[in-house]
Amino acid sequence: MSEIKLIVGLGNPGDKYADTRHNAGEWLIERLARRFNFNLSVESKFSGKTARAVISGQEMRFLVPTTFMNLSGKAVSALANFYRIPPEQILVLHDELDLPPGIAKLKQGGGHGGHNGLKDIIAQLANNKNFYRLRIGIGHPGDKNLVASYVLNKPSPTDWQLIDRTLDEATDCIEILMKEGITKATNRLNAFKA
């Protein structure tokens, strides 16, 4: 039985950003949509694309904000408040500079680590950091001054192969989360290396 009621995939809107590292969370939502056969549709009151699906008998909501990354919290808080979903039942899928490609980690709580999407979500949830995060490794450019351009560029073919396998594993682990709970999903994903 899933403790999670809302899964959010972070990214930037528009074709210009679709294949960039910062959109890793949205890439994962797209895989979940294929796996569980749901379609996201734009809902302006939530500033995002949303879907509802019943998976393993559990109602689940999905959200991809259509705001830019640094305003992601507007969409998350609007949907969470409307459906009365507390932060502890939210899973945010996002790119992670501090993990190499081929690695993903699932955890609850923590800071924003400089991630502007997480920073805004925390602010819009009244500084509540207790939501879950699925961190998709994209690697680090090695110099903090290069981070902004790095996350807004496409991964190399080698990195993409690792990220692709990681997204497949993360999709499997989210299915485990829905059927068997967060602990089992966390243990499996956190042990994975592409």
UniProtKB/Swiss-Prot annotation:
Record site feature (Stabilizes the basic form of H active site to accept a proton), residues: D95
UniProt KW keywords: Cytoplasm, Hydrolase, RNA-binding, tRNA-binding
CDD domains assigned to the protein according to its UniProt record, in alphabetical order: PTH (cd00462)
Main location: cytoplasm
Reaction(s) catalysed (UniProt annotation): an N-acyl-L-alpha-aminoacyl-tRNA + H2O = an N-acyl-L-amino acid + a tRNA + H(+)
Site (Discriminates between blocked and unblocked aminoacyl-tRNA): N12
A molecular function (GO) term: tRNA binding
Protein's cellular compartments: Cytoplasm
EC number: 3.1.1.29
Active site: H22
Binding site for tRNA: Y17, F68, N70, N116
Xref: Pfam families: Pept_tRNA_hydro
Keyword hit for Acyltransferase: no
A single GO BP: rescue of stalled ribosome
SUPFAM superfamilies, alphabetized: Peptidyl-tRNA hydrolase-like
Subunit structure: Monomer.
UniProt name for this protein: Peptidyl-tRNA hydrolase
Organism in which the protein naturally occurs: Histophilus somni (strain 2336)
